[in-house]
């Protein structure tokens, strides 16, 4: 599967490392050339120095013919814009990391789709869900009571 990851920060770098171990065709795009050089030298992936929110950078990264485009920069609006550009270029599926619940609100789902975002990842929400699920297990509740 051809995967383009926009953003080589903590999340994007970690994701690229994990996916490169699974024999995926990974392209990582970011404007930080030093960070990309380190990742390119140490992992089975390709990199493009460019803005994740520019048509030029995303075209060069191959966003127009990728199976999966994942935008995980630290900035929610950049991720939405990157997904919108990638989708318009021809990306099959787009995923954006967000930092507010507003985009997850079911009332906004159709607007998010029209912007070119197929899936949303909200790390804080996922962490809260994991904690709630863990608390449903007896052994976890007992551990907290100690």
Task: Describe each model-derived feature in a short phrase.
Residues 1-146:
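Cytosolic regulatory regions of ion transport systems
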């Amino acid at each position: 599967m051809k995967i383009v990851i926009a953003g080589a920060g903590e999340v994007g770098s970690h994701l690229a490392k994990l996916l490169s171990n699974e024999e995926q065709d990974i392209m990582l795009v970011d404007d930080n050339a030093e960070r990309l050089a380190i990742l390119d030298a140490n992992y089975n992936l390709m990199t493009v120095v460019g803005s994740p929110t520019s048509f030029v950078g995303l075209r060069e990264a191959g966003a127009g013919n990728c199976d999966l485009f994942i935008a995980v920069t630290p900035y929610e609006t950049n991720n939405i814009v990157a997904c919108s550009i990638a989708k318009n270029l021809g990306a099959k599926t787009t995923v954006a990391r967000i930092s507010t619940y507003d985009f997850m609100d079911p009332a906004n789902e159709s607007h998010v789709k029209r912007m070119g975002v197929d899936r949303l990842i909200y790390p804080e929400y996922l962490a809260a869900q994991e904690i709630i699920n863990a608390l449903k297990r007896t052994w976890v509740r007992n551990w907290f009571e100690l």
